[in-house]
Amino acid sequence: MLSRRIIPCLDVRDGRVVKGVKFRDHIDMGDIVELALRYRAQGADELVFYDIGASPEGRSVDYTWVERVARLIDIPFCVAGGIGDVETARAVLHAGADKISINSPALGRPQLISELADAFGVQCVVVGIDSIREEDGQWRVRRYTGDPSKTQALPMRTLDWVAEAQRLGAGEMVLNCMDNDGVRRGYDIAQLRQVRALCRVPLIASGGAGDMQHFADVFDQADVDGALAASVFHSGAIPIPELKQFLRAQQIEVRDGQ
């Protein structure tokens, strides 16, 4: 496997970075560009930006901040939010994003995955999956999680959607484990291991990082390609250079920092 990736996640609302707990009660964390520059300087391998209001509000991502970020950073970044057709995806990529991520729009129209893969290549197409464990013990998919008042519980099992999205042409997947989001108790290793067994494309873990050992655990125990986190990076609780040094000491290969 290639070097494991450390990926700060920036949830965007109204032109600012915000962060919630279990996808609720978001608070302001700072300016988009300032945070992007900070993470680039610290040695982040890439960035992910989620315009969390776009899909619930029926709009596309705001291209202006995408262009600002692209002008100022030189590491790859991925953008998600209301990307429901090839034209919108093309505009986001032309604004400077390296990859586009789709979540709710693909659940409404799965063929979108194939359309984007055909238009831009699978390497540009990331499928994000918001997953939660229900009372029957099954993990199932949620849609429109950027707005708690509009979030929809779907009958589709997470594992079934992983298999379908991969078949349709997803080049990478991000599994957002909603039960663990923002609580800093560690990644959902059990769920990630089941997804890893099905997923032949790069898999990124999201939700639950609270200390450096959590990153080591998810790489060692779930064999993911990258680990995404937000609150521990935004707050400064885990500086990226120290995290990479820690992982190297655990014999986990990571890229050199900037």
Curated annotation (Swiss-Prot):
Family statement drawn from the similarity comment of this UniProt entry: Belongs to the HisA/HisF family.
One of the record's GO cellular component terms: cytoplasm
Coiled coil (UniProt feature): none
Transmembrane segments: none
Organism placement in taxonomy: Bacteria, Pseudomonadati, Pseudomonadota, Gammaproteobacteria, Lysobacterales
Name of the protein: Imidazole glycerol phosphate synthase subunit HisF
InterPro entries reported in the protein's UniProt record: Aldolase_TIM, His_biosynth, HisF, IGPS_HisA/HisF, RibuloseP-bd_barrel
CDD domains: HisF
Enzyme Commission code(s) on record: 4.3.2.10
Compartment(s): Cytoplasm
A single BP term in Gene Ontology: L-histidine biosynthetic process
Catalytic activity: 5-[(5-phospho-1-deoxy-D-ribulos-1-ylimino)methylamino]-1-(5-phospho-beta-D-ribosyl)imidazole-4-carboxamide + L-glutamine = D-erythro-1-(imidazol-4-yl)glycerol 3-phosphate + 5-amino-1-(5-phospho-beta-D-ribosyl)imidazole-4-carboxamide + L-glutamate + H(+)
Pathway: Amino-acid biosynthesis; L-histidine biosynthesis; L-histidine from 5-phospho-alpha-D-ribose 1-diphosphate: step 5/9
Organism: Xanthomonas axonopodis pv. citri (strain 306)
Assembly and binders: Heterodimer of HisH and HisF.
Active site: D11, D130
Main function: IGPS catalyzes the conversion of PRFAR and glutamine to IGP, AICAR and glutamate. The HisF subunit catalyzes the cyclization activity that produces IGP and AICAR from PRFAR using the ammonia provided by the HisH subunit.
UniProt keyword list: Amino-acid biosynthesis, Cytoplasm, Histidine biosynthesis, Lyase
